[in-house]
Design a protein with these regions (language model features):
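Generic protein-terminus/edge-of-domain signal
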Residues: 1-67, 71, 77-78, 112, ...
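A hydrophobic/aromatic-rich effector-binding and dimerization subdomain
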Residues: 2-23, 76-144
């Protein structure tokens, strides 16, 4: 299996529907060709929570090693990929959603004041969450529910 993309590496998979723009999936790196998924991007936000194993995760040129209990926020339009480490499998939950799921209506106060500043900040292409940091562990608990 591999991610279907267009010529610009935009993922072609629908992440939910217009009525409910959210997709939650149970993923396993060994299901992908060579234990990795290709560089791709999408206009949705993606949250990844590692259930077991480790994943080498890259976002816009930054590399991370995520292990059991870690998570990552991958911003809209960020180019990202992932691969097995030392041939060991990784199981994770991927939650992908359209930003409008957070703000509802275009040009709402929530969109303009809170969501858009995060989506357009080039320094926030990704944020790693570790269970060792209290506030991040609270975020991870929500991601794992």
């Amino acid at each position: 299996m591999q991610i279907r993309m267009d010529k610009e590496n935009r993922e072609l998979k629908a992440h939910g529907s217009y009525e409910f723009p959210v997709n939650i999936s149970y993923e396993q790196l060994s299901r992908y060709e060579r234990g990795s998924f290709s560089w791709h991007w999408h206009p949705e936000i993606e949250l990844t929570f590692v259930l077991s194993g480790q994943i080498g995760y890259q976002v816009n040129g930054k590399s991370y090693v995520l292990k059991d209990g870690d998570g990552i926020f991958c911003n809209t339009n960020a180019l990202h990929s992932g691969h097995m480490i030392d041939g060991m499998d990784c199981v994770y939950i991927s939650t992908t959603f359209a930003p409008r799921f957070l703000y509802g209506f275009s040009n709402s106060m929530i969109q303009t004041r809170y969501v858009e500043p995060v989506l357009t900040d080039m320094q926030l292409a990704s944020i790693v969450f570790s269970p060792e940091i209290d506030w991040q562990n609270q975020v991870l608990a929500c991601m794992h529910r």
